[in-house]
């Protein structure tokens, strides 16, 4: 049986080797037939501490690693560039 894979955005990376990933899905309201967004947060294992807040990542289901961690980061699909740009502009202003 294949493992579930989800795509989401890293919300927090303040823990060691753990990131919080928010996965958003769209579903149709049963009565009003309007599409609404629902999101859920997953704790995922990030072995190399390479994920930053805002990155889009692919996570995969795995065995329980701790009380709340049941997922692991497979790959970083898209890096968040804005955080790095603001850091570089602050450094150039100081110099």
UniProtKB/Swiss-Prot annotation:
InterPro entries membership: NA-bd_OB-fold (IPR012340), Ribosomal_uS17 (IPR000266), Ribosomal_uS17_bact/chlr (IPR019984), Ribosomal_uS17_CS (IPR019979)
BP term (GO), one: translation
Top-rank lineage group of the source organism: Bacteria
PROSITE patterns: RIBOSOMAL_S17 (PS00056)
Keywords in alphabetical order: Ribonucleoprotein, Ribosomal protein, RNA-binding, rRNA-binding
Gene3D superfamilies: Nucleic acid-binding proteins (2.40.50.140)
One GO cellular component term: cytosolic small ribosomal subunit
GO MF assignments: rRNA binding; structural constituent of ribosome
Record flagged with keyword rRNA-binding: yes
Oligomeric form and interacting partners: Part of the 30S ribosomal subunit.
Biological role stated in the UniProt entry: One of the primary rRNA binding proteins, it binds specifically to the 5'-end of 16S ribosomal RNA.
Family: Belongs to the universal ribosomal protein uS17 family.
Protein name: Small ribosomal subunit protein uS17
């Amino acid at each position: 049986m294949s493992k579930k894979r989800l795509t989401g955005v890293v919300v927090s990376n303040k823990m060691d080797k753990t990131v919080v990933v928010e996965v958003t899905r769209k579903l149709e309201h049963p009565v009003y037939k309007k599409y609404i967004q629902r999101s859920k947060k997953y704790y995922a294992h990030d072995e190399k501490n390479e994920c930053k807040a805002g990155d889009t990542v692919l996570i995969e289901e795995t065995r329980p690693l701790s009380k709340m961690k049941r997922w692991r980061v497979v790959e970083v699909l898209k890096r968040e560039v804005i955080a790095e740009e603001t850091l570089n502009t602050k450094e150039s202003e100081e110099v």
